[in-house]
Amino acid sequence: MAGKLPISVVIPVKNEERNIAACLESVAWADEIWVVDSHSADGTRDVARRYTDKIAMFDYSGGFPKKKNWALRNLPFKHEWVLLLDADERVTPGLRDEIHEILNQAEKTAQGAGVDGYYVNRKLIFLGRWIKHCGWYPSWNLRLFKHRLGRYEKLEAEDVENTGDVEVHEHVVLEGRAEYLKNDLLHEDFKSIYHFVERHNRYSNWDARVYHNLASGVKTSGSIRASLFGSPLERKRFIKRLWARLPFRLLIRFFWMYFLRLGFLDGRAGLIFCTLMSMHEAVIAAKIYEQQLQKDVSRPEAKIESAERVSS
């Protein structure tokens, strides 16, 4: 491959010293690499400077937008096409070559002019093993697209505390046509299980609000609609809305992942992964219940009842 590819890579980070080098090394072929940092306290920026001088600092004070949407809105991109990566992801040589071919076609010919984005399939490596089953593969994410045409959806959960400053499970809403790439994107966190659990504890705060919104029919502007007969993402959102109303989600999720989706074929790593993700459902359910209790306590009549119990 001669020269750099005409693409802008965006990597949002915070305290990713253990992951960022492998991620940046995997996109060294890109002409422009932006690292968007939330004031990391470790050596993340020192590592990043070995690969790029484009490091943007992100200050988050809550609300909308979070880091990825902020980057898409504000960074002075050199190129039309952007590739969004998390710090614990790596572009494989096959994916790099496929992106190279796409960009060459778009630049030299009219072929591909009608395509505005591409879905990439993430391949999760957990405890050193590819989680091929558990319902986790394939895992399609829109990551390569024309930056003016894509924004992450707004799910009315930005005001929830302790969820972090970056979009996680939101999807990109693309104003245009998208296709699917053949090669995988590796997803492997070099941090410990402690950090996995800590991260999913934050996610559960966000998920609890989203589940509540879906189950209660809260309308959100700028988000993907739920439709059984729509696009794959709209069908996925429809299923998630039904899922949010189900009882015993912890048990259902474990049975679905470990038995129905053959998670037991992924060995001990598969068992641990299914267990942790099922516990994640339990934590979400607990936080939804906690939110409901807090709402009940805040009602005027509830305060009167509480005062009467204290006085009696």
What does each model-identified segment do?
Residues 29, 50-52, 140, 174:
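Short, structured coil segments at secondary-structure junctions
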Residues 10-32:
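Short, well-formed alpha-helical segments that are part of the catalytic scaffolds
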